Amino acid sequence: MRIAVICFCLLGITCAIPVKQADSGSSEEKQLYNKYPDAVATWLNPDPSQKQNLLAPQNAVSSEETNDFKQETLPSKSNESHDHMDDMDDEDDDDHVDSQDSIDSNDSDDVDDTDDSHQSDESHHSDESDELVTDFPTDLPATEVFTPVVPTVDTYDGRGDSVVYGLRSKSKKFRRPDIQYPDATDEDITSHMESEELNGAYKAIPVAQDLNAPSDWDSRGKDSYETSQLDDQSAETHSHKQSRLYKRKANDESNEHSDVIDSQELSKVSREFHSHEFHSHEDMLVVDPKSKEEDKHLKFRISHELDSASSEVN
């Protein structure tokens, strides 16, 4: 950018410097000037009004281009682009001032110099147009699409319970007002859409009430209710089984306890019976020696009496 600015400044300076006619002209030019002095003078010194008329359309074109570019540019342009535009405007002003000064001061210049100045101005404008096109900002903000805020209603204007189809139908409803009312404002469209959606909701609610088709939520609720009933029944059967097993275990334990008690009582009775028999046997053993002694004593008495009787007989 700096190099381009320096080049434009140099071009403006060279155009502003008056060009003096060389005295050492060729012989042919001198001959032509001597033969046709008036024609050469008019050819070398054109009317300044003609120059202004020639430069006016070019200046108008350049000003129109700058105005169009300013209208197209947005406020989100970077500082570098602003600085560049300011520099280009300053250069344009300097070039126009220099061109006017050269027109006023170079009334006696050659037509070739004017042609060179015109060519330099054209090249300057062409360079400006190229630079303006290349410096166009690339990161333009996208146009914001207005989406009206509408209260959502859980009524689906489509097949069954498909949410996607209902959303598509709603999007179609959103697009219809743009086609039917091209001159309407955003507020009118939103109010119209809200009224249409509310009317559609009131129409759809009684239809949905009249329909008795089972939905996914109903089927899910029934399945969950059936599974809960099955779980409750299984829990009840399990509890009944556990109670029965517990009763059986309690009965078995009570029977075992009663059997143990009966066996203990029988063992006690048998022990008592055996002890009684043992005591009776011991008593019998104690009585027998006494009877033997008495028998012996009786036998002794009987034998003694017999002896005494026999002795008396003798």
Curated annotation (Swiss-Prot):
Span of the annotated motif Cell attachment site: 159-161
Tissues of expression: Detected in cerebrospinal fluid and urine (at protein level). Bone. Found in plasma.
Primary site of residence: secreted
Modified residues (Phosphotyrosine): 225
Annotated stretches, region: Disordered: 41-290
Pfam families linked to this entry: Osteopontin
Keywords recorded for this protein, A-Z: Biomineralization, Cell adhesion, Cytokine, Glycoprotein, Phosphoprotein, Proteoglycan, Secreted, Sialic acid, Signal
Post-translational modification remark: Forms covalent cross-links mediated by transglutaminase TGM2, between a glutamine and the epsilon-amino group of a lysine residue, forming homopolymers and heteropolymers, increasing its collagen binding properties. Extensively phosphorylated by FAM20C in the extracellular medium at multiple sites within the S-x-E/pS motif. The phosphorylated form inhibits hydroxyapatite crystallization. Dephosphorylation via a mechanism involving ALPL/TNAP promotes hydroxyapatite crystallization.
Residues bearing PTM Phosphoserine: 24, 26-27, 62-63, 76, 78, 81, 99, 102, 105, 108, 117, 120, 123, 126, 129, 191, 195, 215, 219, 224, 228, 234, 239, 243, 254, 258, 263, 267, 270, 275, 280, 291, 303, 308, 310-311
Highest taxon of the lineage: Eukaryota
Modified residues (Phosphothreonine): 66, 185, 190, 237
InterPro entries referenced in this protein's UniProt entry, alphabetically: Osteopontin, Osteopontin_CS
A Gene Ontology molecular function term of the record: small molecule binding
Subcellular location: Secreted
UniProt key word Signal: yes
Coiled coil, from the record: none
Listed GO CC annotations: cell projection; endoplasmic reticulum lumen; extracellular exosome; extracellular region; extracellular space; Golgi apparatus; perinuclear region of cytoplasm
Signal peptide: 1-16
Compositionally biased residues, Polar residues: 47-64
Glycosylation positions in this chain: 134, 138, 143, 147, 152, 234, 308
Family to which this protein belongs: Belongs to the osteopontin family.
Record note on quaternary structure: Interacts (via N-terminus) with integrin ITGA9:ITGB1.
Protein name, per record: Osteopontin
Organism: Homo sapiens (Human)
Origin organism lineage: Eukaryota, Metazoa, Chordata, Craniata, Vertebrata
